[in-house]
């Protein structure tokens, strides 16, 4: 019988594990586990002279009773057993850590503890085999702490495959910032658009062009005809930011063309080519307005001959007199509510008043 100093399980047998000291005395197969081969183990078992020990080894090698539970024979697999200090800490402090961990093909770790096929069982001095899985210190619950018979993967592998560490660095933000910085150089701000719209309206009125003239001029110069409503909405800042940015350079070029052509001998022709020039508003003197008002009270809708004779007497264009009578009739309709006296009665009363005023 070997001494207690040569038994690596002597400390555990007296403290945490409930094993017979006589059972765990055989320690020679575990002294150098990395040097012990399967052939040496098979040669050493029959020399003890116990028939059950030899029968146990041969039956495992032939019938393979472990195939139904663990997938392969313990003699064909490479088992992993911790050393002395690991067993002591696992039994006394960490009660949940397994004393025996099967080494399966899924968890092949070359840098694990020293492995040997002889670690699956221990022999007593009489040569009787002891199955360590049947002892109280090696319960099934200890083997199933990590779920099933499959041992947990090494900690290094788990940490290296952590989802957070596997996530690639997102460079989308960097690309978007780069594109944003590039676009900011060309895209004007809302304040710049507001200031340009104000200046454009002032310069357009100063040059004598309507909003429709600008739309036609853009179609003549650049091939994009814009309506009067579009130019109006641009000046009122009622277009979308994207459309404002698209329309701003076109209007800016049109202003540059209009300013450069001003003062030259052919400035009128160039401006007329850009679009329909705005007609100047006709200003009528107060005395002339009185004469027209008198004729309107007499005849709200004069004939073409009367308009021509009146235009000649007032030294006005025939079109100006015609437009004035047309606007005056529209004004009368807006001012006269329904149900009032007939217009000819009002006109006759007004004629007398106006005649007296004119004579004065």
UniProtKB/Swiss-Prot annotation:
UniProt keyword annotation of RNA-binding present: no
Record region (Disordered): 98-130, 143-191, 332-360
Biased composition (Polar residues): 118-130
GO molecular function terms attached to this record: DNA binding; DNA-binding transcription factor activity, RNA polymerase II-specific
Domain of life of the source: Eukaryota
This protein's UniProt keywords: Activator, Developmental protein, DNA-binding, Homeobox, Nucleus, Transcription, Transcription regulation
Location (main, coarse): nucleus
Record-linked PROSITE patterns: HOMEOBOX_1, HOMEOBOX_2, POU_1, POU_3
Ranges where the POU-specific domain occurs: 185-259
GO cellular component, one term: nucleus
Compositionally biased spans, kind Basic and acidic residues: 164-182
Record-level GO BP terms: brain development
UniProt DNA-binding residue ranges: 277-336
Localization of this protein: Nucleus
Pfam family, one: Pou
InterPro entries reported in the protein's UniProt record: HD, Homeobox_CS, Homeodomain-like_sf, Lambda_DNA-bd_dom_sf, POU, POU_dom, POU_domain_TF, TF_POU_3
Function statement: Transcriptional activator. Induces neural-specific gene expression to act as a key regulator of neural differentiation.
Similarity remark: Belongs to the POU transcription factor family. Class-3 subfamily.
The protein's name in its UniProt record: POU domain, class 3, transcription factor 4
Organism of derivation: Xenopus tropicalis (Western clawed frog)
Lineage summary: Eukaryota, Metazoa, Chordata, Craniata, Vertebrata
Gene that produces this protein: pou3f4
């Amino acid at each position: 019988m070997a001494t207690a100093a040569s038994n690596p399980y002597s400390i555990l047998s007296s403290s945490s594990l409930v094993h017979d000291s006589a059972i765990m005395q055989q320690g020679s197969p575990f002294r150098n586990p990395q040097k012990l081969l399967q052939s040496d183990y098979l040669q050493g078992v029959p020399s003890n002279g116990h028939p059950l020990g030899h029968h146990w080894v041969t039956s495992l090698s032939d019938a393979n009773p472990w195939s139904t539970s663990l997938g392969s024979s313990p003699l064909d697999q490479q088992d992993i057993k911790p050393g002395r200090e690991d067993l002591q800490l696992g039994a006394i402090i960490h009660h949940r850590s397994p004393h025996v961990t099967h080494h399966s093909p899924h968890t092949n770790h070359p840098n694990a503890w020293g492995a040997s096929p002889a670690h699956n069982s221990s022999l007593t001095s009489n040569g009787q085999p002891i199955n360590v899985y049947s002892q109280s210190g090696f319960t099934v619950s200890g083997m199933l702490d990590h779920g099933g018979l499959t041992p947990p993967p090494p900690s290094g592998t788990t940490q290296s495959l952590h989802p957070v560490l596997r996530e690639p660095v997102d460079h989308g933000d960097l690309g978007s910032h780069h594109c944003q910085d590039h676009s900011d150089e060309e895209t004007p701000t809302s304040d710049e658009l507001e200031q340009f719209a104000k200046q454009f309206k002032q310069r357009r009125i100063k040059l004598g062009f309507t909003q429709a003239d600008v739309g036609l001029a853009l179609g003549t110069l650049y091939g994009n005809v814009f309506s009067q409503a579009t130019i109006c909405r641009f000046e009122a800042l009622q277009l979308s930011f994207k459309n404002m940015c698209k329309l701003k350079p076109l209007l800016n070029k049109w202003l540059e063309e209009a300013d450069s052509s001003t003062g030259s001998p052919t400035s009128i022709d160039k401006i007329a080519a850009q679009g329909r020039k705005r007609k100047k508003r006709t200003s009528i003197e107060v005395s002339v307005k009185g004469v027209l008002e008198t004729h309107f009270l007499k005849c709200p809708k004069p004939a073409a001959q009367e308009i021509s004779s009146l235009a000649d007497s007032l030294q006005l264009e025939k079109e100006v007199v015609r437009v004035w009578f047309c606007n005056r009739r529209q004004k009368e309709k807006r001012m006269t509510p329904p149900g009032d006296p007939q217009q000819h009665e009002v006109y006759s009363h007004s004629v007398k008043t106006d005649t007296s005023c004119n004579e004065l």
